[in-house]
Amino acid sequence: MFEISLSDPVELRDADDAALLAAIEDCARAEVAAGARRLSAIAELTSRRTGNDQRADWACDGWDCAAAEVAAALTVSHRKASGQMHLSLTLNRLPQVAALFLAGQLSARLVSIIAWRTYLVRDPEALSLLDAALAKHATAWGPLSAPKLEKAIDSWIDRYDPAALRRTRISARSRDLCIGDPDEDAGTAALWGRLFATDAAMLDKRLTQLAHGVCDDDPRTIAQRRADALGALAAGADRLTCGCGNSDCPSSAGNHRQATGVVIHVVADAAALGAAPDPRLSGPEPALAPEAPATPAVKPPAALISGGGVVPAPLLAELIRGGAALSRVRHPGDLRSEPHYRPSAKLAEF
């Protein structure tokens, strides 16, 4: 049996700082070592339940039976128990890493990531070399974040078995870019997705360049400029319109025009066109919430994106100030009757 001797919490109250730090280290090592022995027991039970199992093709096979027993012993779900079983069997492939785990020198988090990243390594010689390299260097990887830890492990996998990297085709095939439903109140929408790392790096650099291309009087934060720069790129523009409002600014809307390769239609009442831009749409968050007006202000009507969401009047004013083209859409009742089948341009626009 694995026995540990730890200080009682009452004794720790009278201990000095050095003793407390030593107790923290001892407890952490004992906790890890106990977890390693728990996984060893799970691996042994799994081997007994699944070895030469004639019920391997049953809906409830030996693995499910073992998972049910482990789940009951650990008071966890069947899925978590099955994950622990996979981890315990994977560690059998890395005996030197498992030995450090049993000695309490590697954390459960670190061992779990190592097991997952090396899962696709099948060549025995490559696995042996990888086990030795990871055991030599992994003791210094505890403070690393998960992405940095994965890169450190992948660098060794790439050296001994490049085909087993978990930077696989699955991740590449999951490339996508999603635009969420427009927020009906704020006139914004969420954006998320996955790109090739090279494309993401270029996009990140380009957005930063555009964000720094306006003058110092622009009221927007860098984060807000980067978000607006993505919209400028979508419109085909080569620069971001400055929001300073100065007529002599080289990046103002009056000194260059937005590209018009892509068009969206925003429909608004005439009253909405006279709304003033809201200065609080840009800039850092105010230190204190502004006081509510004594009397409710008259809210200008919002605009609508054709086939999309709502554009609040202050945001519409920002678009107009940024150089958006305006075109009056006439009601069919104000047009002359058309006796032919194909509608005119004005009627088709409506």
From Swiss-Prot:
Residues 331-341 have a biased composition (Basic and acidic residues). Residues 330-350 are annotated as: Disordered. It comes from the Bacteria. InterPro entries: DUF222. This is Uncharacterized protein in est 3'region.
